[in-house]
Amino acid sequence: MSRRARALHAALALLCAAAVLSTAAQPDASYFTTVDVFVVSDTPVAAWQVELTERRGAMQIVGIERGDDSTFRDPPYYDRVAMMRSSTDRIVLASFSLSDAAQLQRGKVRVARVHVRMTGTPEPDYEARLVAAGTADGRPIDAQLSLETQTER
């Protein structure tokens, strides 16, 4: 084997070793967080729809829970197929209650908790939009949307 071939083999071996060591030394940049979704209204809320987006495209939704209000017994409706695609930077959630208006909550009500796996970005950039909110008799109401996150690193 010529001197040039040995030098080329040595350089290639060093390059491969450096590549293996650099990938082994990098920690997984993903982490889990939750996004609590609140609807805020002075009027009792019987139905709502929310669109949640992560602007950087680094969000993978891994689960969805119902909120604190017992009148919304089940988790909100959402597109399960989109969630199973494992890279969802946008999801639409919605729920309704058939309870009497007297049983419905008003004020700041947690209506859902979204479990998220974030990848490749230090801080998520969420955007949320309240698409609709309504009363027990189907009238639209003025309401605001609020998000709270908790990181589980």
Q: Which residues make up each language-model segment?
A:
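Acidic, low-complexity intrinsically disordered segments
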Residues: 21-153
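Bacterial N-terminal signal peptides that target proteins for export
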Residues: 2-12
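Bacterial N-terminal signal peptides
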Residues: 10-20
